[in-house]
Every structure is written in structure tokens, then in C-alpha cells.
């Protein structure tokens, strides 16, 4: 039995050996006692698992996390004769006064409770240099705290003496709830630290809090997915920084805020170098990130121009070089200061959020009422070292909705379904006028996005003709500026709906596109064959930036996402286009760090070298992607799979005990990415059994799923 203390998390990895004759499944019980006292109690542990498995781990009540951290109990599969590990968080119970000195026990049992082996070791650590913030009465604004405040009081509450079952570190928390149209007052926790620290945050499961340091330009939303889970926010120098606490916003207004504790771990030069070293290497790949101010503003109250800089700071931190900022979709109201198209000023709607099928908000209209979106995005992107492109969705008029634009209302005969028809000369002239407008505002580059709505194009030559007109406009402006105006095109890859109408080879040959971004639409065709596109741009000035989808139906980060990136880099692409990048960069902090890897092929390769080395050490497990915002798996989604602890080999899928699909290797998913698999999960409840080859046997796990 051996152990090591992680210098960043200050948690222990404890390793032990499972007896060679152990059955397929064994129960592991972990406990700790103050050194030499024999006062055993459950240890707060989780299995040693990959970041991808941790991401896909089901939340309560389906998940196992609560059992792990409250009972110290977990299951290991097909582990006979192998060394397995648990990660033990000693805080706070086993870390009095910042020091750990305890006995740690691992007991291995059969499922029936027969003890197969018991291992013990002593754990010691001096963590007195770690700073824990959880006495929230110390904030600089005591007037903003109250005991049992009403919502309309707009006060925070520092709650203490909460029951042990609440799973809060010291039985205390900071909690606040304000009226939906007004925020809670910000709180400041004073600090006087020097040097680099790693900062972790712990909240109640599925609660959130807004945090920033006093030197930051933006607030990050953070929250634990599981009880007692510490989330790595960031690492940075803490000289002259205080911590600022805010409640977050949603499309419906301001939400509640909850915080258990914040942990700050000092970092040695060696540890800091290791953390930063994962991003090292030549920046040999271009990273383009799609940013949709509409979606960002859906959950923000944007009333000041400077607010537009806040999300772009995160994009720059993520290493994005080309910012593709959407201004609107042709035929709909636009999200910028247009005097040609009608702006979106009022109430609008969005994609489903949780159980709300059609969420509405006034926030996006508010952004248009008080700010100039296009000018702000262009200006701040350039200030932050990015190359901005003004992006338009090729067309979706959203007929009979608040988003429908004037051109659609006045000329329904120019539509095909919900899209404008590119074969209509007046439509092309209208579209070109909007591009001329954003170029006059100052866009250094422009882009057009035919995904998710390619129906506006009737045939390839229609689009080729339009792109020649667009190229002529861009070149005219470029000559006047003395600098070329690049054109970026996102379009359906082979197999995607209407892909045959997009003649990318002609675009490259005639110089109509500077960036070629073949793409999936929704959950299908994420792993399209890149070879024809590599061949098309060979010897040209056009850069190939295939799309890797950043939305929930795309490959999950980090593992499946970086698997596709590595595959594309090996094929010789010039870089990656992430749609929607804001879903990753402005969401989870760990995703923003994954994005930082993309600009360096060597950084991505190094990530895989490390993952391949750790894979045999992980606890064996099979993990599936959850539903999206709507319950059940829909035809436009795919159930995707990740495995830990075994080599990536054959996998079989049994739906209600019938073999329905087999993969010889990754990418793992139920069915194919073609339309033929849209109905592979029929409507209603099902039992899904997945078998993954593990040496000379099979690792099996069963899941209860629903088809939408």
C-alpha cells in the first residue's frame, strides 16, 4: 500500500492491490482514524478516475458520489491482481489545525460481505499553508449580511450550525436570494497573500456562485456538481487581490447564490511550471471560436458597452485567435446597430432550458437598447489580440415569432419555409448590404454560417454566384483599406443535410474563401471524413478549420473532444473552429483550460500521452453522455460513451437484451452518426447494456435510459 499527496489539491491518492482471486466485482470500504487511536470512521473518497469520467458521472440521485464521500464505499470491477487507487480528501475531519496525521484503511470485500484483504497505512501532511475561506462574517460589508432575510431585503445570510446531513464542511454556508430584477450587493473577502495559488471552490451540489478577484475584468460562475466536490477555478498570483462574491443571473433574472468554502493552495515554482507546462509548445494551429452575443446576453443584463469586453476576456484567456461573433441571421431581427435590418429590441425566446421548453427574456433586447454590439465586439476583440469576424447565420426568418425580420414579413414570397431564398436577386442584395454595413462599422473579417440552416440554398451554382459577389465586396473594401478582408465559411460536411449544395472545391479554386470550416449539424456527423477537404485546400492560401462542436450534443471534454482534435491534427488541418465556443469558454472553467490546448498540436499530443499512461491506473468504468436540456435521447442526438481503466477496443451495445450496434474502437456511440440511427432508441424506457472488451474478457455495465 502506498500514498502520495497531490501538491495542487492537497488530497491523497492511496493505492492498494486487489487479491488475484477476487471476483468480477469487489466492494471497497475506506476509513480513517486519528493516528494510533483505532477510532475508525468513513473516509471521504472517490475512485481514481479520469477528468472525462468525472464529467460524465451521473448527478444525484442516480450517481454514486454521496455513497463514496459519506460511507467511504465504492465498487471496483475486474480488478483482480491489479493496483487500484482512491482519492482521499482529509478536509476538514482528518485535518485538524491544518495537519493530517491519521491511519487509513482499505478493506476489500466480496459483494456478499466476505473480507478478502485489509490494507492500512499512515497518512501525514502539513497543510497549514492552505487558506480556507468559510467564515463569511469577515466580509468587508457586514451591512449586507442578515439573519433569515426576506428575498426583498436583498441581503446575504451566513448560516451556521446546519445539520451534518447537509454535507457542508463546517456546517455553515453563505446563502443569498434577491428579487429577480435586482442583484444582491457584492461582498468582498479581504486577503493579504503573495505569490501563486491554486483556487478551489465548493458549493452545494448544483448550486452556483459568481466569483472574481478585485483585479479581474469578469466574474466567473462556479459550482459543484456533487456534494463536497472541490472545483478548480484557476491558478494565479494573489498579490494585492481580494475575493469578490456575487450572485449570478439567468434568463429569468437574478438567481440564488450559495458558497460553502474557497480553498487557496500555495504553489511552488516547480508545481506552477508543471501546471503551465501542459499548454507549452509552438502555437502551430489556428483556433477560431464562434461567439453568439444573443446567447450570452440571454442570461445577462447588458446595459453598458464595457460589459461586452467581459466574455471576450475569457475568449482571449482560452487562446482563441479568430473571434467569429454573430450579428444575426438573415431574415431575422439582428443583434447589432443596423440601420438596414430591424434590431431586436423586445422580448425573445431561446432553446429549451431544463423543463422550460420555450424560455423567454427581455435581456437580449436590452443589450440592443443600450449598446452597439458590433462595434463593441470588434473593438474589444482587437484590444485583446484576437482577429474578429462579423458573422451572419445564412438565413432563418423565424416566421410569426418575435425574431422575424421586416424583410420576411414584407416578402414572404422570398422565403422557402423559414429561410430566405438565395436565388432571389433582392435577397442577395439585402444580404450584401448587411455585410457592407458591418464592414463600414469596422469588421476586419466577415463570415457566413450555413449550419444549422442550409435550406436557403437551392443549388451549388446559386451559392457560388453569391460568394463571388461577396468576394467582390470584400476585395473592394480591402483595397480601400490597404488590407485584405478575409471570408470564413461554415458549411455542411459530407453527409450532413443538403451538403451537396456546397461546392467548397470551387470556393478554394476561385479564392472565394479564406477559411473553410466543414461542420456537423446537431448531434450527427461529428467525425466526418476530413481527407477530401485537406486535399481541396492543398497548395492554396485557404486555411482548413474543421468544426468540433462545443455544444452539449458534441464530443464531451476533455477526452472525446481532444480525441477528435488529435485525429484532425494528424490529418494535417490548419486548426480548429469551435461552435459554439461560448458554451465551453463561458461555462465550466475546466473547459476553458481544454480550449487553451488547441493552439498547439504538441500540447494536445502531450495530453494524450499523459492520458494513455494513466488509463490503466483508473478504476474500470463505462460512462455515457446524459440527456440534453430536454428529457430523453432525441433522434438528433447520439448517446456517446467513454471508458476508463481499459484499452480502447471493441464495444457492443445491447438494447433490451438485443445486440443493436458494435464499435471496433472510438469514437464510441450507440449507432452511427448518420441519419439512419435517428430512431435507434425508440420512444420510452429501455435497458441498455454496454460491453467493452477488457483483455480476454468483457467489462459490462447496465443503464436505464429513455428515448424521447
Residue ranges and their predicted role:
Residues 306-337, 441-442, 513-516, 571-575:
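Catalytic domains of carbohydrate-active enzymes, especially glycoside hydrolases
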Residues 320-368, 515-523, 527, 531:
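Aromatic-lined carbohydrate-binding/catalytic grooves of carbohydrate-active enzymes
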Residues 185-187, 191-207, 637-641:
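A short beta-strand element within beta-rich, extracytoplasmic domains
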Residues 426-541:
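Active-site neighborhood of glycoside hydrolase catalytic domains
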Residues 126-190:
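Glycan-recognition and processing domains
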Residues 35-93, 97-101, 109, 621-708:
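Long, low-complexity serine/threonine/glycine- and acidic-rich segments characteristic of extracellular
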Residues 278-305, 347-379, 389-441, 559-563:
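Active-site-adjacent "subsite" loops/lids of carbohydrate-active enzymes
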Residues 322, 326, 515-526, 552-615:
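Substrate-binding cleft of secreted/luminal carbohydrate-active enzymes
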Amino acid at each position: 500500500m502506498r500514498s502520495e499527496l497531490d501538491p495542487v489539491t492537497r488530497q491523497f491518492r492511496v493505492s492498494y492491490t486487489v487479491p488475484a482471486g477476487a471476483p468480477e466485482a469487489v466492494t471497497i470500504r475506506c476509513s480513517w482514524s486519528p493516528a494510533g487511536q483505532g477510532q475508525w470512521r468513513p473516509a471521504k473518497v472517490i475512485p481514481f478516475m479520469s477528468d472525462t469520467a468525472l464529467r460524465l458521472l451521473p448527478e444525484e440521485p442516480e450517481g454514486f458520489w454521496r455513497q463514496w464521500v459519506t460511507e467511504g464505499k465504492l465498487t471496483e470491477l475486474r480488478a483482480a491482481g491489479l493496483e487500484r487507487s482512491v482519492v482521499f480528501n482529509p478536509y476538514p475531519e482528518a485535518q485538524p489545525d491544518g495537519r493530517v496525521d491519521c491511519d487509513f484503511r482499505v478493506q476489500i470485500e466480496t459483494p456478499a460481505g466476505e473480507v478478502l484483504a485489509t490494507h492500512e497505512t499512515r497518512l501525514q501532511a502539513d497543510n497549514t499553508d492552505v487558506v480556507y475561506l468559510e467564515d463569511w462574517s469577515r466580509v468587508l460589508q457586514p451591512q449586507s449580511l442578515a439573519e433569515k432575510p426576506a428575498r426583498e431585503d436583498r441581503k446575504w445570510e451566513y448560516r451556521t450550525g446546519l445539520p451534518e446531513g447537509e454535507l457542508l464542511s463546517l456546517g455553515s454556508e453563505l446563502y443569498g436570494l434577491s428579487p429577480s430584477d435586482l442583484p444582491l450587493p457584492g461582498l468582498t473577502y479581504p486577503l493579504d497573500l503573495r505569490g501563486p495559488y491554486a483556487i478551489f471552490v465548493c458549493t452545494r451540489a448544483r448550486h452556483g456562485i459568481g466569483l472574481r478577484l478585485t483585479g479581474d475584468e469578469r466574474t466567473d460562475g462556479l459550482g459543484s456538481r456533487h456534494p463536497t466536490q472541490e472545483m478548480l477555478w484557476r491558478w494565479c498570483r494573489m498579490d494585492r487581490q481580494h475575493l469578490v462574491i456575487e450572485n449570478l443571473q439567468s434568463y429569468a433574472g437574478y438567481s440564488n447564490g450559495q458558497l460553502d468554502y474557497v480553498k487557496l493552495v500555495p504553489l511552488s515554482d516547480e508545481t506552477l511550471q508543471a501546471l503551465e507546462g501542459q499548454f507549452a509548445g509552438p502555437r502551430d494551429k489556428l483556433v477560431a471560436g464562434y461567439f453568439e452575443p444573443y446567447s450570452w446576453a440571454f442570461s445577462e443584463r447588458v446595459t453598458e458597452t464595457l460589459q461586452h469586453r467581459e466574455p471576450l476576456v475569457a475568449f482571449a484567456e482560452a487562446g482563441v485567435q479568430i473571434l467569429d461573433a454573430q450579428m444575426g441571421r438573415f431574415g431575422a431581427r439582428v443583434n447589432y446597430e443596423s440601420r438596414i435590418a430591424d434590431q431586436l429590441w423586445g422580448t425573445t425566446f431561446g432553446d429549451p432550458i431544463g423543463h422550460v421548453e420555450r424560455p423567454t427574456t427581455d435581456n437580449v433586447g436590452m443589450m440592443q437598447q443600450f449598446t452597439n454590439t458590433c462595434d463593441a465586439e470588434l473593438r474589444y476583440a482587437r484590444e485583446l489580440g484576437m482577429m474578429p469576424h462579423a458573422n451572419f447565420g445564412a438565413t432563418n426568418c423565424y416566421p410569426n415569432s418575435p425574431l422575424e425580420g421586416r424583410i420576411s414579413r414584407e416578402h414572404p414570397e422570398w422565403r422557402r419555409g423559414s429561410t430566405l431564398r438565395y436565388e432571389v436577386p433582392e435577397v442577395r442584395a439585402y444580404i450584401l448590404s448587411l455585410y457592407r454595413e458591418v464592414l463600414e462599422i469596422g469588421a476586419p473579417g466577415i463570415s457566413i454560417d450555413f449550419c444549422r440552416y442550409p435550406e436557403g440554398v437551392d443549388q451549388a451554382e446559386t451559392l457560388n454566384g453569391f460568394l463571388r459577389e461577396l468576394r467582390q465586396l470584400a476585395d473592394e473594401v480591402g483595397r480601400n483599406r490597404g488590407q485584405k478582408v478575409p471570408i470564413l465559411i461554415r458549411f455542411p460536411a459530407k453527409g450532413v443535410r443538403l451538403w451537396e449544395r456546397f461546392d467548397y472545391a470551387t470556393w478554394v479554386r476561385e479564392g472565394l474563401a479564406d477559411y473553410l470550416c466543414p461542420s456537423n449539424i446537431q448531434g450527427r456527423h461529428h467525425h466526418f471524413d476530413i481527407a477530401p477537404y485537406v486535399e481541396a485546400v492543398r497548395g492554396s492560401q485557404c486555411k482548413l478549420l474543421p468544426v468540433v462542436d462545443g455544444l452539449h450534443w458534441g464530443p464531451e471534454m476533455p477526452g472525446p473532444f481532444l480525441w477528435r482534435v488529435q485525429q484532425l491534427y494528424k490529418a494535417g488541418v490548419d486548426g480548429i473552429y469551435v461552435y459554439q465556443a461560448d458554451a465551453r469558454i463561458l461555462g465550466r472553467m475546466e473547459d476553458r483550460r481544454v480550449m487553451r490546448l488547441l493552439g498547439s498540436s504538441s500540447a494536445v499530443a502531450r495530453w494524450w500521452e499523459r492520458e494513455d499512461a494513466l488509463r490503466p491506473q483508473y478504476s474500470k468504468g463505462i460512462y455515457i453522455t446524459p440527456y440534453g436540456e430536454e428529457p430523453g435521447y432525441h433522434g438528433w442526438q447520439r448517446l456517446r460513451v467513454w471508458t476508463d481503466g481499459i484499452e480502447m477496443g471493441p464495444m457492443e451495445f445491447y438494447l433490451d437484451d438485443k445486440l443493436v450496434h458494435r464499435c471496433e474502437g472510438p469514437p464510441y456511440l450507440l449507432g452511427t452518426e448518420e441519419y439512419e440511427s435517428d430512431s435507434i432508441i425508440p420512444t420510452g424506457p429501455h435497458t441498455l447494456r454496454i460491453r467493452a472488451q477488457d483483455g480476454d474478457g468483457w467489462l459490462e455495465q447496465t443503464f436505464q435510459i429513455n428515448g424521447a
